[in-house]
Regions:
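Residue-identity detector for glycine
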Residues: 5-7, 19, 33
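Ala/Thr-enriched low-complexity intrinsically disordered regions
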Residues: 29-32, 41-42
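Intrinsically disordered, low-complexity regions
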Residues: 46-189
Length: 189
């Protein structure tokens, strides 16, 4: 197992208790005065879809959903990686641990997705499983296990090269009516 820690020691403090209450924080977009989006996942036989791709002129735009912030961030990571490589071609042969901390949930989500792109580039690895745990105690802490393998050009064909996660229209919402969490992301490809 690979342990990658950026500015935080991996300890018991990073593993959340089951009864943690999450609150919705003002989005980066709201703080910047940008127009908000609605957090409504399209039903798929009355089941929540994990993510959907939206039209964008030059880049890749998606929304990922979850019943919890952890599920939303796992689904966002899956949507990010699906834009790069077919996850069906990726075997879980290795795991990487990522630990991050940020004052706001959106800041943490941005770091999380950026870290996945960083790992892809520096570890020459592709990923297909993302297990995220969160804890909020003043700041937000993320401990995640990512499963995947080293790039094998015979099996992995790449769809898009993701250069970066953009801050443009990046935001997280919680739909209070159905308790659904939603993140909107634009990838610079």
């Amino acid at each position: 197992m690979h342990r990658l820690v950026r500015g935080l020691m991996l300890d018991e403090d990073c593993i959340p208790d089951q009864g943690i209450l999450f609150r919705h924080l003002p989005s980066l977009a709201a703080r910047a005065g940008l127009q908000s989006f609605k957090c409504q996942a399209a039903p798929n036989n009355k089941q929540m879809i994990p993510f959907e791709y939206l039209e964008h002129t030059a880049d890749v735009k998606f929304r990922a959903y979850g019943k919890t912030p952890e599920q939303m961030l796992s689904n966002a990571a899956a949507a990010l990686f699906k834009t790069m490589v077919d996850p069906a071609t990726v075997q879980i042969l290795e795991t990487w641990m990522v630990v991050l901390e940020a004052p706001e949930l959106e800041d943490l989500a941005y770091q999380w997705l950026s870290e996945i792109v960083f790992l892809f580039e520096t570890e020459s690895a592709v990923f297909a499983s993302f297990r995220v745990q969160l804890r909020q105690n003043g700041s937000w802490k993320l401990a995640a296990e990512i499963g995947g393998e080293r790039i094998d050009l015979k099996r992995h064909s790449f769809e898009n090269e993701v250069k970066a996660i953009t801050m443009h229209q990046f935001q997280i919402k919680k739909n209070e009516k159905n308790d659904l969490w939603c993140i909107q992301v634009i990838l610079d490809v």
